[in-house]
Amino acid sequence: MKIKLLIVLIINSLVFAIDNNILVEINDRVITKNDFIIRSEYTIRPSYCKSNNQIHKKIILNSLIAEKLLAIEIEDYISEENFSDNFLNGIKEQYMRDYLLKDVVYSKIDINPMVIEKYLENSLKVYDLYFISIPSEPVANSINMLLAQGIEFEDICRDYLNLKGIPEIKMDFFYEKDPAIHESIFLNSLSKDQVIGPVLAKDNKHLFIKVKDFVYSPLITSNEISSHTNMVNQKLYELTQVKEYDIYIKEIMKDYSVVFNSDVFVKLASEAYNYYIDRNNLINDQVLSSSLIFSKRDSINYYDEIFTLNGNSYNVSYLDNLISKHPLVFRNQNISRKEFGMQFKYALVDLIRDERLNEIAYKNNYDINDDVLKDYRIFSDATSSKLHLEALLKNNNFSLDQFNQNPESIIDNYLNQYIDSLQASYSDNIKINFNLLNEIELTDIDLYAYKKGVPYPMVVPVFPVLTNKSVIDYGKEVNF
């Protein structure tokens, strides 16, 4: 079975989808049309409800309602005293950061139409480029001086940098993700043999680029032109989001100074590398799949200072607490041992950055923001429902492994009946918009959607495997 991966950037509009089309209301819980679609489309559905027909859509709806009912049934027994979930705390804070950035950064983006026109003129070119990436600023300055003196790009690469070959890349308008690099190539028209640079990239390396050649492919039909224009606008918006995000982060972190304790840092980096390589504990090659608790390692003391922030000391215990709710995220994929120390440092700096964003979000009451709470409720109800399910299985002498291996057997012999009893019990409190359900169209393609570069990459919880019944003989039919 092929599963398609749908990558959703954190800045993508999906994260901020506002949906007032209520499909189901149960007490204070709601399931919207958008909830139904993303819970169905952005994770893997069981075979018994993969299609778009009415029977399968009703099974999906029953499953989502069952998840809410299980969560409601158990919520009175859950408190901070008997249940603390760092995963849910982390999910909530991730949504808080998302909506903070949406409001203070992304919603204010307005790209000049004249700038868009300049990009459109160059967006149909595909370049063959030579490039060199220089980590050292003094070396980059020297190269810039040599170019200013009229020395050829190739001669600099051969005689001054001792390169045996010059790296090459083919680049179209939609390839590059670094705003500075993209702007240097596509904002203005470039000619063959033109050299540009130094361009300061996001990884703080200095790029020099020479145009080897390019191909211009004009569009013919009005549909091609319209589609391409929309794609260019979307690409420019995404690049501008990255640029404005960087500006905002630079502003809020300008008075923050982090100094790492080198001895302790080396120990932690070694432990993190072993955890990453030996256990392969990365999701999508970037996010650690579970919290690495440094203070439980024999070589590390719980109270060792790992860094100072603005002169204040923070120990390994503090770092563990942060990581427990915010798994480390690495900027790069396929990290070698040689570069792991630097990538580990970046991951810690990004962790501190996100904690600063959390501080601003809490200060501005994003912990009680309606949109944050709605999105968080999807994950919290899914988690509570899972706790309820595990308790049910245990009380009826089923193991979780048994259920995962053959869920339909347990659903048929036990769970359907239990879910039926909850549906009957809450029937007067359940309102369903069947007209809206009938309008929904689904695909039968297996997709797994995730966001890149965040501690919790899943867009939605896994599909709730709780019932395979399509009959809806409970609740009240309404049009919200």
Protein language model features and the residues they cover:
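Hydrophobic, helix-prone linear segments
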Residues: 1, 17-25, 29-41, 47, ...
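N-terminal targeting/tethering segments
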Residues: 18-104, 108, 295-402
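Peptidyl-prolyl cis-trans isomerase
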Residues: 50-54, 85, 143-186, 197-204, ...
